[in-house]
């Protein structure tokens, strides 16, 4: 291998893995495939994972108190080897948008009336017993009835972003704007002959309708594609979520789940992320004070190096693969995470996001997680993604069938049909 060769790995760690397995829901549910949707829903049954790890409490703390005796002491917030104990299954129990919606400007907290109204608005979409736009492709693409899906109550804060004070992602650098503009222009060109642009829907914002499909259909994307496009020539035209490659950092939850299982051993920490739809992934944090990997070694989840600052776990993450994509940031993404146990059932997470090639300044997100029951999450299975294993060949085969039908005069030109299924929105992120 050449000395300066770049190595890309899909593993979240370098070294010996810690076995982690995915948790089945407590109840039987139907998980909807959201294909880029920004609506955040909470599955009614908790989900997580299980591992075999060192105990964190003494036998006396675990045993129930006998009648008439002094109650057993509360579990310690330290591990058996003396480190702050962050272990358990954790989730955020309320819905908070990443960015503050423009209509709430510099308002840091919702009023109770605003929270109630936002809950009402989401309840009209999720949990309903009717389907919208019957007979349309959009209806077929969202074939699960929303009655099977629940939603989380609106949180008190108007954004997860705590800094800048306006709760918004900082402006892009001029170079990042240029790159984003080129990608957007390419995807809009592939949409121009669809009903989406003809009807001037939000997904075509900034584009225009033209009944003839764009000659750019024959072009490669401006750079490695991570988002959905209106073309299915091959697997590379499908988005990362469609290919079950959504796992990545930072992770702020998604449409079908936001659970973390933290496991500690002397000298090591692993975090398993359950993101719903049968998908999950893990990362291992190196705790031996060693430096980051060489710059030519790149990993999907980056290279995590942790240390303790008092009761806070501080993790520095670098060495991301250029094939990942977080808000336009790829190989230059740098994260500093802070995990702090704030009580027996509460955990605070803070992450500062930095990429000087993408944003004008660093920005910080804060989240609060609640401890979930290990007993209720005792059934487990390996995470898997049916869409990634079986759906993609069907999507590509279906496109070839549509093309043959069009050539034989039996159907419309596939280029005039929006295959993106609502997955392309440019305006403010709605409340999830």
Task: Tell where the protein language model's regions lie, with residue ranges.
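Extreme N-terminal basic, low-complexity initiation segments
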Residues: 2-7
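Short, Lys/Arg-enriched N-terminal segments with co-localized hydrophobic residues
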Residues: 10-29
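PEST-like low-complexity, intrinsically disordered acidic/proline/serine-rich tracts
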Residues: 27, 31-43, 47-432
């Amino acid at each position: 291998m050449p000395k300066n060769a770049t190595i890309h790995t899909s593993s979240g760690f370098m070294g010996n893995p810690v076995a982690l397995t995915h948790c089945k829901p407590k109840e039987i549910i139907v998980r909807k495939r959201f294909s880029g949707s920004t609506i955040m829903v909470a599955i009614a049954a908790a989900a997580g994972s299980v591992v075999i790890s060192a105990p964190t409490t003494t036998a006396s703390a675990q045993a129930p108190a006998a009648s008439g005796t002094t109650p057993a002491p509360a579990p310690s917030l330290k591990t058996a080897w003396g480190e702050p104990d962050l272990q358990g299954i954790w989730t955020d129990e309320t819905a908070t948008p990443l960015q503050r919606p423009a209509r709430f400007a510099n308002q840091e907290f919702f009023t109770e009336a605003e929270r109630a109204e936002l809950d009402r608005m989401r309840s009209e979409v999720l949990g309903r017993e009717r389907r919208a736009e019957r007979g349309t492709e959009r209806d077929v693409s969202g074939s699960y009835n929303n009655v099977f899906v629940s939603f989380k109550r609106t949180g008190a804060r108007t954004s997860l972003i705590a800094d800048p004070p306006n709760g918004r992602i900082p402006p892009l650098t001029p170079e990042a704007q240029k790159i984003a503009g080129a990608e957007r222009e390419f995807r809009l060109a592939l949409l121009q002959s669809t009903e989406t642009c003809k009807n001037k829907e939000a997904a075509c914002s900034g584009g225009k309708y033209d009944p003839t499909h764009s000659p750019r259909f024959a072009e490669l994307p401006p750079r490695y594609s991570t988002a959905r496009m209106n073309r299915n020539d091959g697997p590379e035209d499908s988005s990362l979520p469609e290919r079950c490659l959504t796992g990545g950092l930072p992770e702020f939850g998604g449409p079908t789940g936001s659970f973390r299982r933290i496991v500690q051993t002397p000298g090591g920490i692993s975090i398993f992320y359950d993101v719903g739809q049968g998908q999950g992934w893990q990362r291992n944090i190196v705790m031996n004070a060693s430096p980051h990997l060489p710059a030519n070694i790149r990993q999907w989840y980056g290279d995590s190096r942790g240390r303790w600052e008092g009761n806070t776990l501080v993790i520095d993450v670098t060495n991301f693969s250029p094939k990942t994509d977080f808000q336009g940031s790829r190989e230059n993404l740098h994260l500093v995470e802070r995990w702090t146990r704030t009580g027996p059932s509460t955990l605070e997470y803070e992450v500062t996001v930095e990429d000087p090639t993408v944003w004008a300044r660093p920005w910080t997100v804060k989240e609060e997680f609640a401890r979930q029951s290990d007993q209720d999450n005792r059934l487990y299975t390996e995470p898997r993604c049916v869409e990634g294993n079986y759906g993609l060949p069907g999507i590509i085969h279906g496109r070839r069938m549509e093309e043959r039908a069009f050539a034989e005069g039996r159907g419309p030109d596939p280029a005039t049909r929006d295959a993106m299924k609502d997955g392309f929105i440019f305006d403010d992120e709605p409340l999830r």
